[in-house]
Amino acid sequence: SKSSTETPPSYNQLNYNENLQRFFNSKPVTAPVEVDPMKNEQSYSISADARNTLSPVQCFEGSGGSGSSGNFTSGSQIHMSSITNTSNAGTGTSSGSAQLVSLTESLLN
């Protein structure tokens, strides 16, 4: 038996399939047809030199205000840099070779 305190399903939950069908019937533009990953990648990547010279602590120095959490000791800097992963192998990061796939109705079925 159901509990009387259980929340009944919302209108959107009850009409999920109809909403999905309406979405695909509207034929939305979900992604550009041609994407050049090498061209887009440069706009948000940091050069290797900048990555090696700035520790995570240095990036945020001066933004912590007057509280004690705003001042890190050099010991925490050493610890943070020692756990930084500089390899892309097995980390799930993209090397630019992955193909973007547009969301289509056939992928959901």
From Swiss-Prot:
It is found in: Nucleus; Cytoplasm, Perinuclear region. The keyword Magnesium does not apply. One of its GO terms (cellular component) is perinuclear region of cytoplasm. Phosphorylated with a circadian rhythmicity, probably by the double-time protein (dbt). Phosphorylation could be implicated in the stability of per monomer and in the formation of heterodimer per-tim. Signal peptide: none annotated. Keywords: Biological rhythms, Cytoplasm, Nucleus, Phosphoprotein, Repeat. One of its GO terms (biological process) is rhythmic process. Residues 69-98 have a biased composition (Low complexity). Residues 57-109 are annotated as: Disordered. Its main location: nucleus. Residues 99-109 have a biased composition (Polar residues). Essential for biological clock functions. Determines the period length of circadian and ultradian rhythms; an increase in PER dosage leads to shortened circadian rhythms and a decrease leads to lengthened circadian rhythms. Essential for the circadian rhythmicity of locomotor activity, eclosion behavior, and for the rhythmic component of the male courtship song that originates in the thoracic nervous system. The biological cycle depends on the rhythmic formation and nuclear localization of the TIM-PER complex. Light induces the degradation of TIM, which promotes elimination of PER. Forms a heterodimer with timeless (TIM); the complex then translocates into the nucleus. This is Period circadian protein. The gene is per.
